[in-house]
């Protein structure tokens, strides 16, 4: 059994997302943190690449900063009131946890010698300044969590090995062109909770990125940003001030399977806008100002979940969700939420939901008066 404290630490690092994440980017115990490079280090069969933790006798590196806990290449220095990055960190460290401290600056040599570091956690500090070469030694860094700090810009010269960047809840107002240059491995960026407006994204800001996941929630967006990566599978823009979805807004995002637009001010979705999303499986439009079900849902043959609750929908047509006629192939819905709308649910014809797996998948009632 993996040490309980280590599991607790790693699970605590993930931040709440706008709606349920089905394991796509949840931060759990990653085997990469525990990989051993030599048999002597593990004392067990290394054919699998991961040591048998049950057979290991707990050992502590001779290099462990005062007050920190060091075990199995994990250095935990959280909640210590640290003002700076501690010294005497073992060079074979793979996870360094510095969250919940008072660090205000990352200096040039703070991470010197940590060439094996895989994950760096700096959440909830007071970081406002980062030296341009602070991350240079981190040639194997894949996960950088630097949320809930005082950053006003995205750090320069991020490691090219980086896969996941969580930089939400800072003070970033601008995403300049070239800031992500060379990050060919980047897969996930979480940058919600920053005062970003549409004008803050320079043309080409995301050039070269092949992201699967992007979240820009709880910002100041009034529309869907232009020129986001075409490779996106998940795009979360909830809790903004978006008022409308125009025809060209979703044109380049044909690979999306989850789109989050809940908690905005959307009144209008232009006809045909959703036709550019042939692989869409999950659509969140709850807590907006829609007066009708968006057009085009029956044509999205893979769509299975639609959240439309807490809008101003007054009528639901018999063909709003399902294709007309019989024999038209499409995936069955397993979730449609329409509660907290002013539509009288007793007036909706049962055939409206003929392509839903089960009546329990339909959330209706609690209509607005």
Swiss-Prot record:
Matching PROSITE patterns: LRR (PS51450)
Q: Taking the first listed entry, what is the main subcellular location of this protein, grouped into a coarse class?
A: secreted
Cystines in this chain: 64-70, 68-77, 322-355
LRR repeat positions: 83-103, 104-127, 128-151, 152-172, 173-196, 197-221, 222-242, 243-266, 267-290, 291-313, 314-343, 344-369
Q: Does the keyword Signal apply?
A: yes
Q: Which residues are glycosylated?
A: 42, 48, 271, 312
Keywords assigned: Disulfide bond, Extracellular matrix, Glycoprotein, Leucine-rich repeat, Proteoglycan, Repeat, Secreted, Signal
The Gene Ontology biological process annotation of the record reads: articular cartilage development; blood vessel remodeling; bone development
> Where in the cell?
Secreted, Extracellular space, Extracellular matrix
Q: What modifications follow translation?
A: The two attached glycosaminoglycan chains can be either chondroitin sulfate or dermatan sulfate.
Keyword Disulfide bond listed? The answer is yes
An example of a Pfam family matching this protein is LRR_8
Q: Which GO terms describe its molecular function?
A: cytokine binding; extracellular matrix binding; glycosaminoglycan binding
Q: State which residues form the propeptide.
A: 17-37
Q: In which tissues is it expressed?
A: Found in several connective tissues, especially in articular cartilages.
**Recorded GO CC terms:** cell surface; extracellular matrix; extracellular space; sarcolemma; transport vesicle
**Signal peptide positions (record):** 1-16
Family, according to the entry, reads as follows:
Belongs to the small leucine-rich proteoglycan (SLRP) family. SLRP class I subfamily.
**What exactly does this protein do?**
May be involved in collagen fiber assembly.
Quaternary structure (record)? Homodimer. Forms a ternary complex with MFAP2 and ELN.
Q: What is this protein called?
A: Biglycan
Gene coding for it: Bgn
């Amino acid at each position: 059994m993996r040490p309980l404290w280590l599991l607790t630490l790693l699970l605590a690092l993930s931040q709440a997302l706008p709606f349920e994440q089905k394991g796509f980017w949840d931060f759990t115990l990653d085997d990469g943190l525990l990989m051993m490079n030599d048999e002597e280090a593990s004392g067990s069969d290394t054919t699998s690449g991961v040591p048998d933790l049950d057979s290991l006798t707990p050992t502590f590196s001779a290099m462990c900063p005062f007050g920190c806990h060091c075990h199995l290449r994990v250095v935990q220095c959280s909640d210590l009131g640290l003002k700076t990055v501690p010294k005497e960190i073992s060079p074979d460290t793979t996870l360094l946890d510095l969250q919940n401290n008072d660090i205000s600056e990352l200096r040039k040599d703070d991470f010197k010698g940590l060439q094996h570091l895989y994950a760096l956690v700096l959440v909830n500090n007071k970081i406002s300044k980062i030296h341009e070469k602070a991350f240079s030694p981190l040639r194997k860094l894949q996960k950088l969590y630097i949320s809930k700090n005082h950053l006003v810009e995205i750090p320069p010269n991020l490691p090219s090995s980086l896969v996941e960047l969580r930089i939400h809840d800072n003070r970033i107002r601008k995403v300049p062109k070239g800031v992500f240059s060379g990050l060919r491995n980047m897969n996930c960026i979480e940058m919600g909770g920053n005062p970003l407006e549409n004008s803050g994204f320079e043309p080409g800001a995301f050039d070269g990125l092949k992201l699967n996941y992007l979240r820009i929630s709880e910002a100041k967006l009034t529309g869907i940003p232009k020129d986001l990566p075409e490779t996106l599978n998940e795009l979360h823009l909830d809790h903004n001030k978006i008022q409308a979805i125009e025809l060209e807004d979703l044109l380049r995002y044909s690979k999306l399977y989850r789109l989050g637009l809940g908690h905005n001010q959307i009144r209008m979705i232009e006809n045909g806008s959703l036709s550019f999303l042939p692989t869409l499986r999950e659509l969140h439009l709850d807590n907006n100002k829609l007066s009708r079900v968006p057009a085009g849902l029956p044509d999205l043959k893979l769509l299975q979940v639609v959240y439309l609750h807490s809008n101003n929908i007054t009528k639901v047509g018999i063909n709003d969700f399902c294709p007309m006629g019989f024999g038209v192939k499409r995936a069955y819905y397993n979730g449609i939420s329409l509660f907290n709308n002013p539509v009288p649910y007793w007036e909706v014809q049962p055939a409206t939901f003929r392509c839903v797996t089960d009546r329990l998948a339909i959330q209706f009632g609690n209509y607005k008066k």
